[in-house]
Curated annotation (Swiss-Prot):
The keyword Protein transport applies. Disulfide bonds: none annotated. It is found in: Cell inner membrane. This is Type II secretion system protein C. Belongs to the GSP C family. It comes from Pectobacterium carotovorum subsp. carotovorum (Erwinia carotovora subsp. carotovora). The gene is outC. It holds the Pfam family T2SSC.
Length: 285
């Protein structure tokens, strides 16, 4: 009796991919539907393929090419291991009260937030370079270090005080919109409640003799985005960027690499034929 190999380490309870400006409506729709698909796939892999004692909280991700500490399959921290020091005391202090925004010339382009501080990662951009950093790590070019990492910000310790660095802080400060109002509304809704993604998209694992055949995609109660993305009822998702979502190891690798992807190719089976849905964040698709 065939069985899928369980993931060796905890994976994502939820995965929320936040795309920056998508000028064309097709890119907007495909980007949002991909957000929903990846979030739902992450929840399903966590439910069906992980050990019973796995525990993980919300994750927030933006497509970014992180440098240093490369990801390896089976390692949830993706880019390396955080220091062993217990920062629980300083974490409580850093998260209480209002914290001023940092004036450092850096931006936060991605976050992987875990209930275990040692597993959380911040992707920080400075001078056109991007770096992955854990709690306790130093900020490139500054005598500052990361104190806490949460779903939408990191808290830094710089010159004896705490400062906050938020996702899209630079865009919010200049008043520039990061995406359309509709995208922000759905993104915020999913970030607050990951399972609300089911209002737009439902995903069900399809098995045959206990072997996973793929993930069946269907519209939720708000089906407009589903159909505008070119999806059809009962499409069967089988791979992402060439990695087989039906294989536990490859599915884990696909989820782990999402933070560094700028091009996405979701393959679905439809009426016995494979169809590709393609999105390039840096192109005109």
């Amino acid at each position: 009796m065939a069985r899928l190999q369980a993931f060796k380490d905890p994976s994502f309870h939820s995965l929320v991919a936040t795309f920056r400006s998508l000028p064309l409506i097709r890119r907007f729709v495909l980007g949002l539907i991909l957000l929903l698909i990846c979030q739902q796939l992450a929840v399903l892999t966590w439910r069906f393929l992980l050990p019973e004692d796995s525990r993980i909280v919300g994750v927030s991700v933006t497509p970014a090419q992180a440098k240093e500490k490369p990801a390896t399959p089976g390692d949830f921290t993706l880019f390396g291991h955080a220091p062993d020091a217990d920062a629980s005391t300083v974490n409580d202090a850093a998260l209480s009260g209002d914290i001023p925004l940092t004036s450092l010339n850096i931006s936060l382009t991605g976050v992987l937030a875990s209930g275990d501080a040692k597993r959380s990662i911040a992707i920080i951009a400075k001078d056109s370079q991007q770096y992955s950093r854990n709690v306790g790590d130093a900020i490139p070019g500054y005598e500052a270090k990361i104190v806490t990492i949460s779903a939408d910000r990191v808290v830094l310790q710089y010159q004896g005080r705490y400062e906050a660095l938020h996702l899209y802080q630079e865009e919010e400060a200049t008043g520039a919109p990061s995406s359309s109002g509709a995208f922000n509304q759905v993104k915020d809704e999913i970030q607050k409640d990951p399972f609300s993604a089911q209002d737009y998209l439902t995903i069900s694992p399809v098995t045959e003799e206990e072997v996973l055949k793929g993930y069946q995609l269907n519209p939720g109660k708000n089906p407009d985005l589903f159909y505008r993305a070119g999806l059809q009822d009962n499409d069967l998702a089988v791979s992402l960027n060439g990695m087989d979502l039906r294989d536990a190891d490859q599915a884990q690798q696909a989820m782990a690499q999402l933070a560094g992807m700028s091009k996405f190719n979701l393959t679905v089976e439809r009426d016995g034929q494979q169809q590709d849905i393609y999105l390039a964040l840096d192109g005109d698709h």
